[in-house]
Design a protein with these regions (language model features):
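Beta1/beta-strand and adjacent pyrophosphate-binding region of the FAD-binding site
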Residues: 2-15, 32
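Dinucleotide-binding Rossmann-like beta1-alpha1 core, especially the glycine-rich loop
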Residues: 49-127, 246, 253-258, 262-266, ...
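C-terminal catalytic lobe of FAD-dependent flavoproteins
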Residues: 150, 253, 262, 284-422
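Helix-loop-beta segment of a Rossmann-like dinucleotide-binding subdomain
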Residues: 4, 82-91, 125-164, 282-289, ...
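Glycine-rich FAD pyrophosphate-binding loop
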Residues: 24-44
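Flavin-dependent oxidoreductases
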Residues: 18, 177-292, 300-308, 392-414, ...
Length: 558
C-alpha cells in the first residue's frame, strides 16, 4: 500500500469508484481508493440500477446526462460489460398538474440537451401493451433511458481506473483523518497515507467520515423497498417472440417505478412512512445489509400497480429488497468542497447514486485538477446547508425528501417538515399580519402577505397562483408609500483592518464604495472569472466594510 499520494478517495461504491476513475482520466493518476469491505458492499449492490434522466435541477440533470452517455462507452473502453439496457423510460400522467410539470421539465431537458418526447395514451399502450391507459392524460418518454447492472458498472470503472494507474485497496478501513499544514493523513487499519486531497464517498458512513474531520455532513439514509416477481407468461411470450423489452415504466401519480426482470417485474414504490435508517451510522461490520421488508407500507402502491398493470397482480413475489438509500434534506446530492477545510471534498447523499455517480466524479475531477467545475454546481453545493441541519432535522427532512420523489414538483413549492426552525424577532408580528412563509437556510421568511380575506396559505401551481395579486399590492404600496424589509435572514459579515480595501478590491469585479456610508452592489468572481456571489457592500470606515449577501449563501460566501 502506498504511504503517499495526491488524492485518497474514501469509499468503494459506484460513487467513489467513479471519482477515482475520473481523476485518473483527467491525468491525475497518483490516486488511491480505500474501501472498508468489498467494492459495492454498501448500497450499490442492492440498487435497482435505474438511470432516470428526469430531474428538475439543472445541476443534477447535467450530471445524469453525462453519466448515461459515459456508461454506454465503458464496455468499449474497459472490456467490461456493464449490463446497460437502453430500453427507454416512460413517465405517466393522470392529472393536469402532472402534465404541467412535464411541460416545465421539457424546458430543462431542452436546455441541457436531453431528448424527451410527449406520448399519447395510445402511444403508451403501443410501447407497454400490459399497461392500462384508460385514465391517462399522456406521458413523456426518454428514449435513451434504461437500466444497468450496478456491480458490473462499478467494476468496469474500477478496471478503467486501474488501467490508468490508480490503485484500489479493499478491506482497508479508515480509522482517522488528520489535517496537516501540507494536506491530510488518512489513517487506516493497514497503515497511513499522506495526501493533498481527501474525497469522502462513504455513502451510509458519510456522517462517521465527516466526524473524523469535524464536519456534520447532512446525510441520513432512508429505507427503500422494491419487489421482484415471478415470471409472467405474457412477458415470457414476448421474449420468445423476440419483441423488445417494454422499458422502464413510472406511474408518477401512484408513486412507483416498474421494469421487466427475468421474465417477471420489479416494482419500486416511494411510499408514505418510509423511515430514516442508520441515523447514527451503520455498525463497523455492516456489509451487504438489508432490512426486514414491510409490505403493509407498500399496500396502496401495490393496488395502484395492479390497476395500472393488471399482470402484476397475476404473479407471485420472488423477493423483496429493503435497503438503505442516502438522502439529503432537499433530495439532491452533496458534491463539492467542504466548508472550512482546505482540499477536503464531499461526494455524498446520492439518492440516485447509480445515475449521478458518473457525473459527480466528472465534475469533482474538473474541480480538483482545474480549480473550478465546468457546469453550474450550485444545486449540489455542500455549503447550501448550515449548522441548523441537526440530526433530528435531517431525519425529518430526509424522510420528507424520499416521500416527495414522485410528487409534483411545483416551481414555488415550500415543504412543511421541520419548519419554524429559525425565526426573526418579528416573526409573530408578520404572521399576524398575514405572512405566508417560506424557508431559506433554515430561516422562516415571508413569501407574501395574504390580504382581503385571502387564506393564509400558498396554492402551488404551474400557472398564476394567488400570490400574484398579493405581491402586486405590496409592490404598489412600496411604490406609492413605504415598505419595511426584515433583513434578519440575510448573510452578513464585516471585513476590517489594514488591507481590507485591497482585499475586497481583489475579490470583487465592481468598484467599491469610496465614501463612508455609501453602498455598492458588487460581484465576487471565481478563479475562472465567473460570478461566485453578489454582495451589497457598505463602507463603514476607511478600513471597514459591511457585507450583506443572500441568506441561502451564508456558508458558501463566508
Amino acid at each position: 500500500m502506498k504511504t503517499k499520494t495526491k488524492v485518497v478517495v474514501v469509499g468503494g461504491g459506484v460513487v467513489g469508484v467513479s471519482a477515482l476513475y475520473h481523476l485518473a482520466k483527467k491525468g491525475l493518476t497518483d490516486v488511491v481508493l480505500v474501501e472498508r469491505k468489498e467494492l459495492t458492499s454498501g448500497s450499490t449492490w442492492h440498487a435497482a440500477g435505474l438511470l432516470p434522466l428526469f430531474n428538475m435541477s439543472y445541476s443534477v440533470g447535467q450530471l445524469h446526462k453525462y453519466a448515461v452517455d459515459l456508461y454506454k462507452k465503458l464496455e468499449e473502453e474497459t472490456g467490461q460489460n456493464v449490463g446497460f439496457s437502453v430500453v427507454s423510460n416512460i413517465r405517466l400522467a393522470s392529472t393536469k398538474d402532472r402534465m404541467d410539470e412535464y411541460h416545465q421539465y421539457a424546458g430543462v431537458a431542452q436546455t441541457i440537451g436531453v431528448d424527451v418526447k410527449f406520448l399519447t395514451p395510445d402511444q403508451v399502450k403501443e410501447i407497454w401493451p400490459l399497461c392500462n391507459t384508460s385514465d391517462l392524460l399522456g406521458a413523456i418518454q426518454h428514449p435513451e433511458d434504461g437500466y444497468i447492472q450496478p456491480a458490473d458498472l462499478t467494476q468496469a470503472m474500477a478496471t478503467g481506473a486501474r488501467n490508468m494507474g490508480a490503485e484500489i485497496y479493499r478491506n482497508t478501513a479508515v480509522i482517522g483523518i488528520k489535517q496537516t499544514k501540507d494536506g491530510w493523513i488518512v489513517e487506516t487499519d493497514q497503515g497511513s497515507i499522506e495526501c493533498e486531497h481527501v474525497i469522502s464517498c462513504s455513502g451510509n458512513f458519510a456522517r462517521q467520515t465527516g466526524k473524523m474531520v469535524g464536519l456534520d455532513i447532512p446525510v441520513i439514509p432512508v429505507e427503500h423497498q422494491y419487489i421482484v416477481t415471478e415470471a409472467h407468461p405474457d412477458i415470457l411470450k414476448r421474449k420468445k417472440e423476440g419483441l423488445p423489452e417494454m422499458g422502464v415504466l413510472r406511474d408518477s401519480d401512484s408513486r412507483w417505478y416498474m421494469r421487466e426482470e427475468a421474465g417477471g417485474l420489479i416494482l419500486g414504490p416511494y411510499e408514505d412512512g418510509a423511515p430514516a435508517c442508520y441515523v447514527d451510522g451503520p455498525s463497523k461490520d455492516s456489509e451487504y445489509e438489508l432490512f426486514q421488508e414491510d409490505l403493509d407500507r407498500l399496500a396502496p402502491h401495490i393496488e395502484g400497480a395492479i390497476h395500472r398493470v393488471p399482470a402484476f397482480g397475476e404473479v407471485g413475489v420472488k423477493k423483496v429488497y429493503n435497503g438503505a438509500i442516502c438522502y439529503t434534506p432537499d433530495g439532491n446530492p452533496i458534491v463539492g468542497p467542504a466548508w472550512g477545510l482546505k482540499n477536503f471534498w464531499i461526494n455524498e447523499g446520492h439518492s440516485f447514486g447509480i445515475t449521478a455517480a458518473g457525473g459527480a466524479g466528472w465534475q469533482l475531477a474538473e474541480w480538483i485538477v482545474d480549480g473550478e467545475p465546468t457546469i453550474d454546481m450550485l444545486g449540489v453545493e455542500p455549503r447550501r446547508f448550515g449548522d441548523y441541519a441537526t440530526k433530528s432535522y435531517l431525519k425529518e427532512k430526509n424522510e420528507e425528501a424520499y416521500n416527495h420523489v414522485f410528487k409534483v414538483h411545483y416551481p414555488d413549492e415550500e415543504r412543511g417538515a421541520a419548519r419554524e426552525l429559525r425565526t426573526s424577532p418579528c416573526y409573530d408580528r408578520m404572521k399576524n399580519l398575514g405572512a405566508v412563509f417560506g424557508q431559506k437556510f433554515g430561516w422562516e421568511r415571508p413569501n407574501f402577505f395574504a390580504t382581503d380575506g385571502m387564506e393564509q396559505k400558498d396554492d402551488w401551481s404551474f400557472r398564476r397562483s394567488k400570490w400574484f395579486e398579493a405581491i402586486k399590492k405590496e409592490c404598489k404600496n412600496v411604490k406609492e408609500n413605504v415598505g419595511l424589509l426584515d433583513m434578519t435572514a440575510f448573510a452578513k459579515c464585516r471585513i476590517k483592518g489594514p488591507g481590507a480595501e485591497e482585499f475586497l478590491d481583489y475579490l470583487v469585479a465592481n468598484k467599491l464604495p469610496k465614501k463612508i456610508g455609501r453602498i455598492g452592489l458588487c460581484h465576487a468572481l471565481n478563479t475562472k472569472g465567473g460570478v461566485h456571489s453578489e454582495f451589497t457592500i457598505m463602507r463603514e470606515a476607511p478600513d471597514s466594510f459591511y457585507l450583506v449577501s443572500a441568506g441561502a449563501n451564508q456558508r458558501l460566501d463566508h
